């Protein structure tokens, strides 16, 4: 099975998370996508909602989307959500499956600052989402890694038959439709009493309104 993994604070989860995940799922013929809320994001301030509230919102979204499932292993952890620890745990749960960890190009270019980043490739492929026409500068230090581990590059140099059995360690660049949406923007709108109906799935908006979340 080919399993995509999209982690995030999801505070709240919105179409800027969901639409790229759907596009990646189709582009790489993934069997399912795991949406994985963080508990203690190492690179972010603490979230506005409780872990339980964010889990509920993501679970609601997954119930509306075919092939999407909530993954709560980071949310249940009491230590920081380092990706390499999570992927190692997921790989132990899915030893025969291919894992595809989804990130934006903005995260990829910072990858060397991640905890034990080289070991990510031991457990999963990386999917790097990029805007149409955008390319990493040839002189950027991450370009060499992107080129060497590119799925297309390895198929060209190793041959398709050999490559199909590689179930981790590759990078799959995927061009996605730009989504000019941020959780900060949504929280600010809600705090002002505005209803961002175009940015949130109805099930998410219903939960936020019923629970009176993000009010000033």
UniProtKB/Swiss-Prot annotation:
One of its GO terms (biological process) is NAD biosynthetic process. NCBIfam families: cyt_tran_rel (TIGR00125), nicotinate (nicotinamide) nucleotide adenylyltransferase (TIGR00482), PRK00071.1-1 (NF000839), PRK00071.1-3 (NF000840). The keyword ATP-binding applies. Keywords: ATP-binding, NAD, Nucleotide-binding, Nucleotidyltransferase, Pyridine nucleotide biosynthesis, Transferase. One of its GO terms (molecular function) is ATP binding. InterPro entries: Cyt_trans-like, NadD/NMNAT, Rossmann-like_a/b/a_fold. Its EC number is 2.7.7.18. Coiled coil: none annotated. Gene3D superfamilies: HUPs. Belongs to the NadD family. Catalyzes the reversible adenylation of nicotinate mononucleotide (NaMN) to nicotinic acid adenine dinucleotide (NaAD). This is Probable nicotinate-nucleotide adenylyltransferase. It catalyses: nicotinate beta-D-ribonucleotide + ATP + H(+) = deamido-NAD(+) + diphosphate. Disulfide bonds: none annotated. It holds the Pfam family CTP_transf_like.
